[in-house]
């Protein structure tokens, strides 16, 4: 049997074949459990990244009147739709929007990205001024 560390593709093929054959005793159970747990973590990470990007672009929109270009509007729409698509594909992600730490971390990530651009001098609020539902509202563009 191929070890996961040696050849992940061969290992996965073997594990799938064992599952199909009902040979459960031969499965690499601990590794499979770990990978299943990581699958959920990866989805949460993708969602965090998507929300942080939407927030960053909304911050740019709000704080740079001259920067309210068609390109930025399109970026907001595209990133927002990516976040919504993730929510549709994995509805349980919505519970993360209610978690204060998730939302605060996404906000702080967005603010840090804006500050790293070097174009920002004004301070931002310590917490996000918009609700998750507002951020995901396709008609919302802050003034």
Predicted regions and their residues:
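Surface/interface-facing alpha-helical segments and adjacent flexible terminal/loop regions used
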Residues: 1-143
């Amino acid at each position: 049997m191929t070890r996961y560390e040696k050849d992940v593709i061969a290992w996965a093929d073997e594990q799938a074949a064992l599952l199909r054959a009902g040979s459960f005793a031969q499965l690499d159970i601990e590794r499979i459990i770990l990978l299943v747990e990581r699958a959920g973590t990866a989805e949460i990470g993708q969602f965090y990244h998507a929300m942080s990007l939407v927030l960053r672009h909304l911050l740019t929109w709000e704080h740079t009147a001259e920067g309210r270009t068609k390109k930025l509007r399109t970026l907001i729409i595209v990133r927002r739709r990516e976040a919504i698509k993730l929510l549709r594909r994995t509805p349980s992600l919505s519970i993360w929007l209610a978690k204060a730490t998730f939302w605060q971390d996404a906000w702080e990530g967005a603010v840090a990205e804006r500050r790293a651009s070097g174009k920002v001098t004004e301070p931002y609020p310590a917490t996000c001024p918009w609700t998750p539902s507002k951020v995901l509202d396709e008609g919302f563009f802050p003034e």
